[in-house]
């Protein structure tokens, strides 16, 4: 019977697609149930810290328009994937832009937020060299293509083109839930901003 066969979850922990909470029933299906992957929260915390550290180390040049607002855009891979949820929360936590929802930082995409009024995020702040900067998530969206595939690099490349046209030099940092989307955004953005 299937109930006695080994079960291996690989790369994606079974979880609630809305909250990211682990599905313990699936993870403990039988005594031969395993998960092979990494700790999503630890990776997310590291990513958020690295983004924050980069901003602080490059503060003299990162605020491209000198408005005192460090604006970032965020490519979200899959709104129901535990890694995507964790990475979005990790960046928002590190930058102070996260808002609590049901006991965790909200990981929902915000659409656009140029005025800082989105309810899923808030303006954060960083003090560097005696000056306080506002940190604002200008836009975020799930990178899902028309066929329904998520984590889509081409969609991310198109998104940065749209965001760059809309926000111009308000964008100081580009953040992504994975390398493929991040590289696509970098390539499209750098081509448009020689």
Regions picked out by a protein language model, each given a short descriptive name:
Residues 1-194:
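A residue-level marker of the well-folded mature domains of exported/periplasmic proteins
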């Amino acid at each position: 019977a299937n109930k006695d066969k080994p079960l291996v979850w690989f790369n994606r922990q079974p979880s609630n697609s809305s909250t990211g909470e682990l599905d313990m029933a699936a993870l403990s299906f039988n005594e031969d149930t395993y998960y092979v992957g990494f700790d999503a929260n630890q990776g997310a915390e590291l990513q958020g810290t690295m983004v924050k550290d980069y901003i602080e180390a490059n503060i003299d040049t990162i605020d491209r328009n000198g408005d005192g607002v460090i604006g970032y855009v965020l490519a979200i891979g899959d709104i129901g994937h535990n890694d995507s949820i964790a990475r979005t929360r990790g960046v928002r936590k590190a930058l102070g832009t996260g808002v609590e929802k049901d006991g965790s930082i909200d990981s929902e995409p915000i659409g656009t937020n140029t005025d800082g009024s989105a309810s899923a995020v808030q303006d954060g702040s960083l003090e560097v060299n005696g000056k306080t900067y506002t940190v604002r998530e200008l836009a975020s969206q799930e990178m899902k293509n028309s066929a329904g595939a998520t984590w889509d690099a081409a969609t991310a490349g198109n998104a940065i083109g749209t965001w760059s046209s809309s926000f111009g030099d308000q964008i100081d940092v580009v953040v992504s839930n994975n390398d493929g989307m991040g590289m696509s955004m970098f390539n499209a953005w750098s081509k448009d901003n020689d």
